[in-house]
Amino acid sequence: MVQEVELKAPLFSDCTGDGTIGYLAGADYNMGRESRAEYGEELAPIQPDKMTMGSSVQWYSADKGKPTRFPIFSYGLQFNEKNCEKVTMGEWKWETGMNFNQIDDFERIRDYGLMVIYSNWSFLKNELKDNKKYKNRALDWVAYIAGKRESRRLLGDYILKQDDID
């Protein structure tokens, strides 16, 4: 049985990452980046495109006080001394999927994020020349759901533009 609910408030904020509440309520929305000319924003691309903000798979490691092991992740991405991320936790900059549909391709985006984490961590633990920092560390937590930033951009009474921030 479907129950219809009506909510009233002076302001609603849809923080689902996909604009799901607004979408289900029938709100207008855009996906991707608008052209520079649409809102007069100099940082926007000249032509519109489908690129969106990405999703991040968060993680952190912990010092276990003694050496820990991690399997060699040879079937993942190949990292080396130049392209590895020498970090002990994931941050929001570990973002992926900007060129995919953040709704329809979300599982693929999340899986790729996991592959990046495990591939990079394997390199740090097993191959990095100066890996003293990682010898006693182990992955302590890896999110199984990626954190979304934005897929649908809801269009309301006012649209925030670059000029509002500059």
Question: What is the meaning of each model-derived region?
Answer:
Residues 1-166:
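Flavin (FAD/FMN)-binding glycine-rich loop and adjacent Rossmann-like elements that form
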